[in-house]
Structure formats: structure tokens, C-alpha cells
A protein has these predicted regions:
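Structural helix-adjacent loops and short alpha-helical linkers that scaffold large soluble proteins
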Residues: 151-160, 212-220, 248-257
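Auxiliary, metal-adjacent structural segments of Zn-dependent hydrolase domains
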Residues: 41-94
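Short glycine/serine- and small hydrophobic-enriched flexible loop segments
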Residues: 143-150, 203-213
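Acidic/histidine-rich, surface-exposed loop or edge segments in extracytoplasmic proteins
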Residues: 28-45
Length: 275
């Protein structure tokens, strides 16, 4: 039976809102949020930005599990920007955090509706996979941003389903190649086809979620919640992450799927999505 992205999202919401499921993974408390004001903001602007990022960080951890480290937010002004958050990037060192450039003239509602913070904060749920595995990290964050926005109540599952199906449909033609998936993704990145690289890579996590639902009756989000509690602090790279996924699921599917994306023909990998 074909499992759609919508059904995956619905299952995730059930897990998040079911205490008997989520409490087992919530061994650690929510991360402490630490703000660094890199430019001048008045008190009203600070309150709005803190409300936005605190709500987003909470929804992120309700989705993927509580982070076992403090989260640092570095806030810069971008008064001339035509959107609330024109730029954001993660900080990956001894400190785990995100740098945001923001235009504080936008409303709180516009900040909460923006995808940048869910995308960037979700990156921190997994160790930095390395520059050569950017397809993996960006596919992960792009997949998670929609689920976090649903948790925040900013979009319905149906709206995210429609958006994701459209994005996946648009990027499929770029992967009609006999070259390995990661080779095609890397070529798209070099040629600045970033949306196609991001959304094509989302399929890895669609496949993971669908396999988990069919084989174990759990979602990718539930697996991530378990992962934060047991393994996030110790894992250092992509191989560590996948080994942890194998161990937590008692299954080699995560490592087998990674091998398929590393060595399988791109067109064949893409054709398997949703089956």
C-alpha cells in the first residue's frame, strides 16, 4: 500500500501528542535557550524575537526530541530585508546554535510563519554530516521544517502535503540519470540548483519514515526522539548517526538506504519514493 507524505505527517502528530509514546523518549529536559544580541534591539523587538524563537525551538524539540545541549541564538539586524529572516545558518562547534539575520519590523505572526528557524534549528538534531554530505543535512532540515511548522499550527498537514508533492514533482526531472544519487545532488549544488538538491534529498527521509511506519509502526520523529536521548551527544558524523539508527531500529534499513543513495542510480532511487 502506498503511504503518502500526508499519512506520515498525521502519524507523526499522533506520536507527538501521545504521552505514552513521547514521555519514553523525553529522558532529558528541553534545551536552555541563550540569546546573543549582536546588534542593538529595543526591548519590544527583543521580546518579539524571543517569543518567536522560543516557540519554534519548543516545537522543534516536541517534534524531534529534547536536545542534550544548550541552544545559542546569535541575532543580527537586517532592517532593509524584504522578509522576516533573510538569512540563517547553524553554528557547529563546541557551541550548538544558529545565527539569524532578522528584520524586526515584521510582525510576530510573520516570523512564526517563516520556514527559516524550523529549518535551521532542526539541523541541530543530528551531528554535522560534513560538507561532502550536504545533500543529507539539507534534505533532513527541509523535510523537518514542514513537520515543525505543522506542530506550531502554522500549516495544516494537507497544506504541507500539497507543497511537498509539488516540490518533489518539480525536482524529479533533475534526477533522471544513471549516475549515483549523491553525484547528481553534488552536481546540482555546484551549479547552484539548490532547491532541486534540497528537495530531491528529502526523499531519503520520506523513505525512512514510510519504512518505519510499515515495519515498526513508528515514525521518523519517534526514532529521532529516542536518538536525542541516547546517542546525539556521542555521535560525531553521518556514519555514527546511521549506525545509531540501525541499532535503535534493530534493522539494517537505514544503512542499506544510505548505500542506495551513495551508489544507486539516481533515477531508480527517485522512482522508489512512495512505494
Amino acid at each position: 500500500m502506498k503511504i503518502t507524505l500526508l499519512s506520515a505527517f498525521v502519524a507523526i502528530l499522533i506520536v507527538v501528542n501521545n504521552p505514552s509514546i513521547s514521555n519514553s523518549a523525553s529522558i532529558i529536559p528541553p534545551a536552555e535557550i541563550i540569546f546573543h544580541w549582536e546588534d542593538h534591539f529595543n526591548n519590544k523587538e527583543k521580546e518579539k524575537i524571543e517569543t518567536w524563537l522560543n516557540k519554534t525551538a519548543l516545537a522543534t524539540q516536541q517534534t524531534v526530541g529534547n536536545y542534550p545541549f544548550d541552544i545559542h541564538f546569535y541575532i543580527h539586524r537586517a532592517d532593509n530585508a524584504k522578509e522576516p529572516v533573510p538569512w540563517g545558518n547553524t553554528e557547529r562547534s563546541e557551541i550548538q546554535g544558529v545565527t539569524f539575520h532578522v528584520n524586526p519590523n515584521f510582525s510576530l505572526e510573520e516570523f512564526l510563519h517563516d520556514w527559516t528557524a524550523p529549518h535551521e534549528i532542526s539541523h541541530l538534531a543530528i551531528p554535522f554530516p560534513g560538507k561532502s554530505n550536504r545533500w543529507f543535512s539539507e534534505g533532513f532540515a527541509t523535510y523537518m521544517q514542514g513537520q515543525i511548522l505543522i506542530e506550531m499550527g502554522e500549516f495544516t498537514p494537507e497544506q504541507i502535503e500539497t507543497k511537498y508533492q509539488k516540490k518533489l514533482s518539480n525536482c524529479r526531472p533533475y534526477y533522471q540519470s544513471d549516475s549515483p544519487f549523491i553525484v547528481v545532488a553534488d552536481s546540482l549544488k555546484r551549479n547552484h540548483h539548490y532547491p532541486e538538491m534540497y528537495w530531491g534529498s528529502v526523499t531519503f527521509f520520506v523513505n525512512m519514515d514510510q519504512h518505519l511506519q510499515k515495519s515498526e509502526g513508528k515514525s521518523l520523529n519517534e526514532l529521532l526522539q529516542e536518538y536525542q536521548a541516547c546517542c546525539r551527544s556521542n555521535d560525531k558524523n553521518l556514519n555514527d548517526l546511521i549506525r545509531s539508527f540501525d541499532r535503535l531500529t534493530n534493522d539494517t534499513y537505514p544503512s542499506d538506504l544510505l548505500e542506495a543513495y551513495r551508489f544507486g542510480k539516481a533515477r531508480e532511487v527517485m522512482s522508489e519514493v512512495g512505494k
